[in-house]
Each structure stands twice: as C-alpha cells, then as structure tokens.
Amino acid sequence: MTRAKVIYFSGEIPQGDPEGDQRNLFRKLHLLSKERDYPILASFLETVTWAMKEEHRRLVRAQRDLLPTFESILDLTDHVVELRKTSLGGAIERVLVLAFQLGSFIAYHEAHPLEYNFQASDTFLIARGPGMLSAAAVALCPSLPMISSISADITRVAFRFGLVVDQVCRSLEVSPDEINSAGAWIYCVYGVDPQKAHEAVTRFNAEKAYAETSMASVFNDDGKSVSIGGPPSTLKTLFTECDFFKRTKNVPMKKVQGMWHTGKVYGTEHVHQIIPKIHQKHQLYLPLFSPVKGQPLEAASATDLLEQIMEEMLTQRIRWDRTIQNVTERLKQASPESTQLIAIQPSQYVESLIGQWRADMPTTTHTTEDMMSAVMDLPLGNSRAKDAKSSKIAVVGMACRFPGGADNAEKFWELLAQGRDVHSPIPSDRFNIETHVDPAGKVPNTSKTPYGCFVDNPGLFDAMFFGMSPREAEQTDPMQRLALVTAYEALEHSGYVHGRGIHARRVGTFYGQASDDYREVNSGQDVGTYFIPGGCRAFGPGRINYFFKFWGPSFSVDTACSSSLAAIQAACTSLWSGDVDMAITGGMNIITNSDVYAGLSNGHFLSPTGGCKTWDEGADGYCRADGVGSVVLKRLEDAEADNDNILGVVLAAATDHSAEAVSITHPHDVAQAHLYNQVARRAGIDPLAVGYVEMHGTGTQAGDSNEMKSVTNVFAPSTGHIRDRDSPLHIGTVKSNMGHGEAAAGIMAFVKTMLVFQKGIIPPHIGIKTRFNPALPEDLAKRNVVIPVTAAIWVRNSDRKRLAMVNNFGAAGGNTSIIIEEAAPRPRTSEDVRKAQVITVSAKTANSLQENLKALVDYIEARSELSVADLAYTLSARRNHYNYRVSVLATSTAEAASLLRPHIKTSLSQTPHSGKQVPIAFAFTGQGTFYIGIGAQLYRDSHEFRKHIDQLDSLVRRQNFASFLPVVSGNVQPEDVSIVTMNLAIVCVEIALARLWESFGIKPSMVIGHSLGEYAALAVAGVLSDSAAIFLVGTRARLLTSKCTSRTHGMLSVRASAADIKHAGGDIPFEVSCINGPNETVLGGTLSNMEALSATLAAAGYRTFKLDLPHAYHTYQMDTIVDELVKQTETVVCKKTTIPIISPRFSRVMTSEDSIDVSYLIGATRETVDFAGALDDAWQSGLVNESTIWLEMGHHPTCSGFISRTLSSTRMALPSLQRDTDNWLTLAKTLCSLYSAGIPIDWNEYHRPFEQALRLIDAPTYAWTNKNYWIQYRGDWNLTKGRAMPKLDPTTTVVPVSKRFQTSSIHRLISEQYTDGKAILSAESSITDPSLQGVVDGHAMNGYGVASSFLHAEMAFTLAKRVSDKSFASAVSFGINVADFEYHEPVVKLINTSEPQPILVSAEADLEKMEVHVKWFNPAKEIWYCHATVFYEDPSSWLSTWSRSTKLITSRIDALNDMAVTGKASKLTTDLAYSLFGKLVGYSKLYQTMQSVILNEDEAMAEVQFPEDTGGSWTVPPHFIDGLISLSGFILNGGTHFDNTNNFFITPSWKSMRFARPLTPGGRYTAYVRMVPSDNHSFVGDVYVLQGSEIVGVVEAILFLQWPRVMLNRFFRPADVTAKPAAKVPGKSEPSTRPHFKPHHVSRHKPTLTPRSPDEGSENSDSSGVIISRPGGYSSSDQDMEELPSPPAGMNDDMEKALALVAEELAVDIGLLTDDALIADLGLDSLMSLVMSQRLREELGLEIRDAFFLEITTIQDLKALLR
C-alpha cells in the first residue's frame, strides 16, 4: 500500500460563537452551493432541508411552533442559541452537525474531485458521537453523489436521535424550558485515572441509593479526560459531595443537550423509534470503526448499520482507546509509505492520533487535511451559477425622471451631492393651490399642505418616436409615457439591442404604480378612445412590452409606497425562477389629483411644512413626490457574457408584512428585522458586512423610529456579535432631498444606491433641520452607526466587496428589502488592433439627429481619456439605429469630434432613408491583382473568417490540392505559389469574404463574377457547393499547368472599345478576352502579337497595360484543356440559383428559371467575359438601378471601377479588401459608407473578435423631439363633487333672446337657453357689417381684409361674459381663459360688401364644470372652421402663479434694453416696425399700438400704448389683443432671423389666453415673447403682458406654422375673387395642396338652421328666429365639429375624404400622409383601426374589415383600395 487514508468525523460543530463561527461556515456552504461547480453540495443541502421539513411536519403542534420558519437547513444556524431553550435544541444541533460535516466533505471533494478515490483496502473511517452518522453516510456510498441520495435518511436519524434524547432526559428530570436549565447532563473531568473515576462513580451511586435511571455513569475516557453523564441534580451532587471529584478539574458541558451512551436509561425500543427503513441499494462500502468495540462494524444493509450505530450511541460506553489501537495496528500491518488523516475540523484527537502514529511508525510519512479550513479557503465566483435561482442579478442600465430637474442619473447625483431639498409649492399645471389647499382644513376635499416635489415638464413626450398618435399621447398617463421613455433610456444605457444576446421573447417588465391621477382627473374630463389603454395601470408595463416586442410577462405592482421596490423584487424573482432572462423594472408616480393630497393630508401622512425631515425632532410627515425610474436587470453570468457594464449586483430580495403592527399603516420593527435577516441569509452575507442602508425614512415619527430600531438591531447590534470600529454602518434616505415618491420611492432609493456604489461617496443627509430625533436609539455612535450630515467617502475594500441594503415600507403593511453588492471590476482580456473605428449616430427625426450629434460632440470633447474603440463599439453594436444617419471613420476621439461637428449644421437638411430594402450586388474579382497575404489580418483576428477559410482549406486538402493557408497568412514567397494554389486561394477567400459579409447582415440580392470570380459567385448563389467550386477551380488550374505552356501567351488591357481596337490594330491577330467597360477591353494572344498590338495601339493614342499572367485566358489557348476538363468534371452537380446571377458569359441576367451546368463554366473558361454587356442587361432589365450598392468580394477592387464606368449613375461600389491596406481599415471604410446609405448592419458580429477588449461607455442618451401632451385639470370640480361652486343664480333658467344685446363682434343672438346647469347660445355676425369694417379692413393680408384670430377671441370673450352675467350671482367675478383655440381656415372679407358675409357662433356651457365650448361655422363653405374652450377661473391665482416668473421676464426685458443700447439688438420705431410687418400684414392706424420694438433674433419686447377710444363696443378689443400679441408674429414675419422672404408664418392656435385685468383704453403695456422651433416647420412661444412690473396677461403656447410664400394667395383670397397669380420664388414650385393651418377633425354633418317655435321668443320681430341645433349623432367633443383636413389636389372624392379622415383621427398633418408613409409610424393601433374602419364604412360606404388598417403597411395601400 502506497498511501493509507483515515477519515475522522468529530461529534460536534466547531466550538465558538454559534452566531459567528457557525454562521460563517454555513454561509460559505450556502454560497458554494449556488455555483455550477458544486451541484452535489446543492443537492445535498436541498435534500437535508426537505427531510427536515418532513420531520417538522410530523411533530405535534406544540413542538412545530417552536421551530422558526426556514428556507434552508442552514438558516437554522441563526436560531441555535434560542432553540437550546426548547425541546428541539438537541435535535436541531444534531442535524446541523450532519449538514456541516457532510456539506464540507462534499464541497471539498467537488473542488478536488481526484481526491475522492477511497477504497476499502486503503481507507478507514473513525468517528465520535453524532459524527458516526456522517461517517455512516460516507461508508455507505462508493461515489460522492450517493451521499446526497442517502442524506435524507441520515437527517431523519439525526433529528429523531435528538428528539429521543430530549424526551428521555426530560422524563428523568423535570425541565420546563431548557433541558440544561438545572445544570449540565455531562461533565468532562481532566487528569484522573479512568478506572479510579469509574470506581468513585460506582461507590457514589451505591451510597446515594439512586434509582438506576438517576445514576451517574462514566461513558467515555480518552486517556486525558473522562466524561460522566447523568441527571443534572445527580451530577451536581457528585461534584460537590464526592471527595474524589471535588478536587478534580471538571467542566460542565452545558451546550450539550442531554446525555446518552448509557444503558441505564436507553434500550432497543429507543433505537427502533429512531431508525427508518432505508433502501437496500446502500451497502457498506468502506470500513467504519466502532468507537465502542474498536473494530470495523459489520452490517448487511444501511438499516442494519445505523441500528448498530444508534444502539452504541445510546447504550454503550465509548472506548476510544480501542479504536485508536486497532486502527494503528491495521496501518502497521499495511505498511503504507504515507498516511493521511482527513479531519472535518481541527481537534485534540487529531493531534494525539498523528502524534501516536509518528511514534509507532516513524518511517512513514504522516499528513493531515483540515477540510473545514480548506472549504473556507475555496474561492467564490470562479464558476457560473448552477441554475437560475442561484444566480446573482446584475443591474446593467438605469434611467430616471426625478424631481428637481433630475432627468438623468448624473443630474440626480449632482442634486444629492449638493444636498439640495427640492420641495416646492404645487405647480399650477397640477391644480390650483389657491382653491385646493386650506391649511386650516375647513374647506371640504382640500389639502392642508401646498408642498411637493415635482418632475419638470412631465407632459413632454416624443409621440412619433414611440408610434403614438398625438391624440393617444395626450390621453395616455404621463407617468406611463415616462416609464416608456425611461425604459428606452435604461435599455440604451445597458447596451440592449434587439436580437443581440437576450431574446425578446425572454424579456419581461415589472413596474410599481399605486395611483391613477391622470385618468381619474385629467383625461377623465373628456373620456376618449384611449381613456382605458392610456390610463389603466396594467397598460404601463404592457405598453413597454408592446413597443419593444417583448414576449415575457408584464406586471403592474401595487403595494402602496413600496410598489417599485416590490416590482424590482418581482423582476428578480422572475429571473431567479427562469421565467425571463432580462427584466425592465421600476416605478412611476406623477401627481395630478388633489383628492389624494386631501386624503393623505387628512390621514395625517403629509408634512404641512414642506420636505421630509427624516430623523429630525420636528419630523411631521412626508412630502409627496413625482418620480419615474427604470432599471434593467439580468442574471450576472448573462450580463458578463453580453459584455455589459454592471452597476451593481442584487444578491437577495424579499418581502414580508407587518401583520402584527398596531394598525395596517403602522410599521412593525420585529417583522422588518425578520426580513433583513432573511435577505442576509439568502445573500449568504454577514449583516455586519453591510456598509450602507438606504432606508425608507419618510419623516414620520412612527415610521422612522421603528425602522431605525429594526435596522440597527440587525446590522449594528448593541450586544453579541457587534460591528468593528473600522467598519461603520452608514444610513441615509433620498426622501430628505426629493420627497416620498410613493410608488416610485423604491426606484429612487435603488438608483441612488447604484450611484453611491459608482461614486464611492455617501451623500449628505439633509433631513436634520433642527436636531436629531430623541426617539432614535441613544447609542448609535456606540453601535458605529453614522448618519452623514456631510458627504462621506465609502472606501472600497480590496479583500471584500461593499454591500448595501435598500429598504422600503408600504403603507398597506408590506416591507421589501434588497441586498446589493458592488460590481467587481472587469479587466480587458484582449486588445483591439483596428487602426480606425466607425462612429455612428442616428435618429428618427432630423431634430433628434442634430441634438444627438451636439450631445455626442460635447461628450467626446469633455473626455480626453475616452477610447475611440469603446466609443465606436457603444454607438454601433450597443445602440439601435434609425433612418436619419451620420457616420465617420476616426482614429481618435478628437478626430471623431472634429468630423462629426460639421454634420450638426447639415443634419436638419438630411433626407431620411426610406427603410426599404436596398439591392446589394456582390461582385467577385478575377485574378489580375493577386498578392500574398490576402485577408491576413482577417484570418488572424476574425473567428468567423478564419472558420470559413479553415473549412475551405480542409476541403482543398481533402481533394489532394496543396493548402492555400500560407498564401492567406503571408508565409510564402510569390514565386513559390503555383497557379493551382493561387486560383484556389482567390476563390476561397472570396467565398469566405461573402460569408463574413453575410455574418455582418449584408446579404446579396444578386451576384456577378469576373472570370475566375464566377466560381465564387456561383457558390454564393447556391449553384455550386463549396466542394464543387474548389474541385472545378483546382482541376482547371491543374490542367492549365499541365497542358498549357506558360508565358507563351499573354493578355493586354486597353483603354478602348473592341471596335476601336479592331479599327486601330490592323491585321495583328488577337482575341477579345474581357469587355470590362465601354472603353475597357482585355485582349489575348501570343506574346509577340500582344507586344506588337500594344505598340500599334499606343501609336494610335490608346493606353495599354500588359497583365502579369502566365496564360491568355478566354482565348484559343484554353482549347487545349476543354475536352479533359469536361471529362474530369462531368460528375459535378449544379443546383438552381437562389438569387439572380448577372452572367458575363451570356451578357444577361440568369434566374432560377435558367439551367446552369458544368458546361456553362467550361464555356466561361474559353469564351469572352462580357462584363460590361452583363451589367448593361441587368440595368435594362431593371434588376440594377441607381440605388443598387455594389460590394466587391475580392483581394483588390478591380470590378468596382468597371461597374462605375459602365453604369455611370452607380450609387456606390465598395471594396472588401485592398492591396497594401490593412484589412480592418478597408472593411471599416466600406461599413461606414454602407451605414450612411441606410443599410442595416450587424455591428455585434463586426466587433465580436475584439469584444473582450471593448467596454460599453455611458454615452449621451437619445435626444427626444418632445412635445407637451398634457390635459389640464380645469376648474374645481374635484372640490365640489357635484355641488356647484359658485351656486347658479336660481332666477336664471331660460332666458329669452334679448333684442338689445349687440356688440361690435356679436351682431345678433339667435337663441339663448339655460337649463339644468347648462347654457346654449347661438349667435351671428357679418364680416361685411360696418361695425367690423375698421378691425377687418385694418388687418389686411394679401391685400384683403381678414377676420383675424384675435377677432374670434373677442367673440369668445363676449359670449363667455354673456353666459357668466346671465348664470351666476352678480357678486361673482371670474377671469375668462380662452383656451385650446384652433383656427383652421381664414375668413377673408368679400369684395362685394353689399352682401352679408355671415358667420355663426355656437357656445355650449357646462356651468358646473365652469367651461364653455365655442365653435364658429362658415355657412358659405358649410364648415366648422374654428373652436375654443373658455374656462371661468380665478384671476388672482393667475397673478400669483405669474408672479413667480416676473423676475425672469423682467430680466429678459432689461437685457433686451441693454442690447439695444449697445447695438446688439435692433430697436424699431412704430413706423419702421409696421413697415416691416407689412411684408405679411397691412395694419391700419387703428392697430398700430406698438410704440417701439426691440428685436434680437428669436426674442423681442414691445412698448404698447392703446388709444383712448376703443372704436366700438367690445369686451376685449381685438386690436388691443393684436397690439400685444402680434409681437410673436413680428419676430417671424418682420425680423431677419427667419426666412420670411420665401415663407410666411401664421398662427392657427394657442393653448390659453388670459388677461387678469381689463385692457384699458389709453393704457401702457409691455409685451415680451421668445419664439422657438417646434415640430414640422412650426414655432411656439409664450407672450407675457406686463403693466408696469407686474405680469397681467399671458398667451401661452401660441403656435405659428411656416408656409411657402406662394401659398399666400391661396390662403387669403375672397371667395368672390378668382385666383391671381402668385409671385414665383426662384427654385420653388407651387404646391398642389389646398392649404390648412393645422391638423384637425371632422364634422360628420353640417349644422342645420332650425326654425324656433313661437313660444321661444325672438329677437327680431320679422322673423320666427333660428337656432343652431346639434346634428344627429354629434359628439359634444369639440374636435368632432371641425373641418376635415385638406388632401392633395387631383384625387377622387373618396380618396380625399379618406385621407382627410385618417389625418383627423391620427391628429397629424395631412402632409405626412405620403405614399410611402408607414401607417404604424403615425401612431395607429388596433383601437384606432376600429374607429377609422367604422368611419370609412359609415361615411364613404366602403366595405372593409375592422383590422384593415392593421393589415396594410403604407398610405399607398390605402389608396390602392380607393382607386
């Protein structure tokens, strides 16, 4: 025997603190069990846990309740001390001994599998106490996996053994709780003679006359000590009264639960209670020595073995000396060269045993192996997780929209680092705090606090990008929109690209949302098509899945304040369960509902004084906050495989409930502490290793104190295992900075924690406004708990990773906690050798492209250390690509920035790529430019290219041709390369190049091959197999070598046509080998003839070039090989082509209908290569056109030149390789061109060879083309709840039409009705009426008077005031807001003013909602052409809101004045200003109220003074409005910053027009506005009106559309005037579209004039009167009363109506409905399809399916139906 092994199992868990040492041991086993290298350990622990749970279920209720819940058997280590006080303590310790010993044994041998080579002949097992059970498991199992299979039975034995011992011992001595409470059952006595001790015990028992069951007994001696067992009272008497033992050194073993090894109390009946029947497959395999007899146990089965062991453990005295003696004798007899004592843990027995062996066997080498230490030293993380549930979760991307302008993670960090508190009064776009807040709490349904923390501009959204129509966008909850946006940004941050790595079918979304404010309040004011899908919570994550085409689950989670952290946990759980491979998760909260404020305020949740004062003595509740955030999660191993940036790693997550709290909303510190311990166990970490806890910390007294208590008790306990002084616990909460985001609170905390890891700084806690809350634990400093009032550095430890916990409490009682570990740095393991990189930028719109370019250039220039390779990799392989594109080739980031910068200016004029598939032709080169080392760099670096080359070379060698690899690698001299090898190398490299391009996503639409290149072309087209192509090329070349004499014939390239050559060449014989272009011909013949011909042609002025080739290909010289070539290749099989082949042999295109066989290729060897003729035929046939892109497969671009010169309109012809140029540089140039041409490229495959050298960088996110989609909450109906406020005047029910009511703008009231809180007015005015002459003629456009939009505004003011005066009590005063005004078709005054030119006005008021819908109808055209909504509001609240902007506006006015003084801005007089304005509008003196104008590009101010006389009877004179507001139009039409020579700008709409005080005659005002670009050639601005230094009026979001000046005559021409020619603008053609200002909506029916009944009264005595009645089926929505958009001229009526209908329903400009416009891109979905299909059926009589619009692709498809 060369080596003997003795395995020793002791009888206990390692000594020491059970909550320290033991936890560390079991924690290590837990972590190892999660790794793929330890499957048997994982199986073993699962089996032991399962068996333990089964045994637990068998217990009686009283005992079941003693055992705490556990997920793994290892969790019970946390409860050892407590369990010792119960009847289960001993049983649990026995099971933990088993789990520790066998777990360590298995882990060690899984790490060192070769060491598990135990044989019965050289291995002995010895053990003591419960260690015998562990030894039995090993003895019964010849292989390691079998230990796991028997472990369930061994676990049951261990547990039952403990139960029996406890049961028996309690029957001997009463012990109500801890079995050892009265004293120890075992004493260890040192330094006594065993025999004398035995005799002393015997005498003592006899003297005391104990019953046998109460006697003491010696059950073990090991030479150094004696163990005595017995009831505690007996042993206490023994050691206090017995003279022999009083003087001994003895130790009571109080940790040992009970006694055994005594036949006085145990018998076979106890053995039978313990031992289950075990499957007979387990037989004794290794010798196991009895600690009683000292001999190997003999057993016929596992059951037999365990019964023997248990009988000895219960009833027999241990004789360890016998065991040692017999084992030693066995070893001596075997005489091994060495012995190894394998012990689970160090012990005195191991040392004594080794010492004895060394004395008895001095010539033998003796070693020991401490498995426990070896296991503790095993590295973690060296292998992948064994399964999904064992994985760590990587956070790979994040994005946010948080309060205080924190629109991305970096801005969020700046806010935290600066210690900012961003709470503010509730913005007016949410609701009016003047009416909805009552600090006294007396007004019903109001909030007591006006504060919150709010996201900037929550309505901003890029609807077109996300395929949503403007209508759908407006009706969709902004928090769901922002969830979609942040999901995109987080995915972009993570480098996710569809089709790369994670499959879309394996991605899910999980979002927390706990309110529906927008649906309940904002969109609920006017329920539309998208009320449900736009507002219900399930659609939030569902819309994300739908947009990105994710197939995984989408969950909306509501657990109140912990919703988003619970959603993150749900996402992690889905990853752990294997349901998904990637999750996008987060939370959302946008506040608009005053009811929630009122409810929380009345429920005493909210602070009445402002922000969250967490841990402050004055904490008085929380401050509400907006917030939307998204993170991207993957299993760690997947993230590493995908080369992602890992921001942090989730180790464990869990949720429990504060079910025992005093109320449902009250936290419970015990439940919270239980949760923290649970996640720590799952994570396999020591809670004291956690360095930072991001707490819930809302600033409520109950919540803060309970959470602090639970956190400190677990992570910084005051007793027992406490924190080291150099390891403080920092705590913080984001809520002190930006409030409580409620459903978004968890994602705010989570993102903050990611940033804390990233920055290595814990930002200051700013919640302490006065002093620390005295309710917090007094010993925080002693516990080493730090609340950082200033920023604290969180030092990275080299030997362990930093750990943090994020904690959330939900108001409904849920607690969610997540343990996060910092990400380990990942070194680069290779090098990117490419000299130049392709930098790509793209967008869906020109504006976004420009902004993307600006942001990127700024980003690059600010980071000199940036790697250009990382930049290229991020922007190409890890970003999505769109149709507006820019790409540059750069060798450095500085060069990249300089090349990108010029594109910023040109990007707005860029034409997008259509998205249609561009035809790509692969052209395969001949042999004329051969060189050594073709594709050398690709072969070296690209696995894909190398794979194909190696496969092809393998085929070459198997056909008995020489390898061509030396030609590729460059390891050969040119003269040593045969024709055969050269030809094979050329063709095989071309095939490999084609396959490489295909891996890049570039696949050929057609192929053409030149000469030798035809073989590669046919292989790529599927005609020839690779093997057949190699065989044909090799055979042909071999025949050429053997049958054709080299260098007797040659080839001559001539820059002339064949006809010119024939004419100039005289009688010199030659053959035309190749026709490469119109004036490019290759000739063949004898060398002498070629030399003569060269001289002759040169003399004639033609350029010639002799080709360095050994033969004259495609001439009669080839005749010598044709017959033999036919014979040798007749078995070659040719298939039908899969793509068109442009054939130079036949000079035509060949398709799958053409037959190609070997004769084709043999003929091609001999016959002329008519490359130019083939190209010409392809062009004539339409296969090739201007858009075709040519990609040359070959070692040098020769065909590219032929193609460009033959087809002069060729778009581009690009090379794959180029002589004397690095392969990667050539590829990069070509890819750059392809990308710019709109070709989809698989950049991941391009970068794959170097990916381990590349890193994803945090480049700027996509720049959105945002527009504000926001439905404003109007009025105060949330307060009234059906109770009208103010009360309606009860006397006003039905009002007869007043004959006396007439103003300058409203000439006649047709009808006026007031019923049930509603009012309906119909009125009429005539544009030709003398009362309007001044304001209409004084506002002339194109030379004609126009009823301006401001005149229509005056009408709205007048009718609204009429309704108010008649409906409300006289004491009530309102401000009138003319809002959502849209003016779709101008009203131009007729030339013949003798005829009336009426317009009808309808006003419908909802007096409870305090709003009036006003519409204008043009009877002459039978269209509703204008509409607005008037709101009655409190002007004092306007003034209050505007006052916050006063400083900003006045500062801009002051700046403009200063610029005028210095000449930087233009100051214009009245005459000059209106003269410039005259380019578009001819203003009469009545209108010329601007006294001076200061103009600076897009910004202006005007000093305005009104005349003393209003010139009529007005509510708000239209020329007064014009004098203030037309400054916005002057910037565009009168200045020089905008092109108003070729264009003009007119306003179709504004969002709101409000004047808080009357515009007084003679009054002096200041107007200020800045106009900024919006969508689709439009501009928008807010006009501020100041009286003195106070803002008294605002026109918000006034919109101007840009139109070509040639349209002016079309827009502004009276109906009774024929069209006059418009002035032509050079380079401009007149559009064929009938103009309309803005996309708008349809009137299903024209209005009807219905006679009034006599009893309704009439204003005119000569008329029965009329009212404008609502048409049948008319919706009260004002959109339905508008005119259809106008389609292009020249269409049939149905087509015009259909396109107008589509534009109306999608709320898009009809100009966007071009033939190739994609329906889906315009925002169409299934709901909109139903609506439009129904309308086409009803209004046009078309028979179409509901799904019609989902089945068509473009507008052209719709037109095809209508033709």
Swiss-Prot record:
Residues 390-822 form the Ketosynthase family 3 (KS3) domain. Residues 1334-1588 are annotated as: Product template (PT) domain. Keywords: Acyltransferase, Phosphopantetheine, Phosphoprotein, Transferase. The active site is at C561 (for beta-ketoacyl synthase activity), H696 (for beta-ketoacyl synthase activity), H740 (for beta-ketoacyl synthase activity), H1339 (proton acceptor), D1522 (proton donor). The modification O-(pantetheine 4'-phosphoryl)serine is found at S1726. Multidomain protein; including a starter unit:ACP transacylase (SAT) that selects the starter unit; a ketosynthase (KS) that catalyzes repeated decarboxylative condensation to elongate the polyketide backbone; a malonyl-CoA:ACP transacylase (MAT) that selects and transfers the extender unit malonyl-CoA; a product template (PT) domain that controls the immediate cyclization regioselectivity of the reactive polyketide backbone; and an acyl-carrier protein (ACP) that serves as the tether of the growing and completed polyketide via its phosphopantetheinyl arm. This is Non-reducing polyketide synthase PKS19.
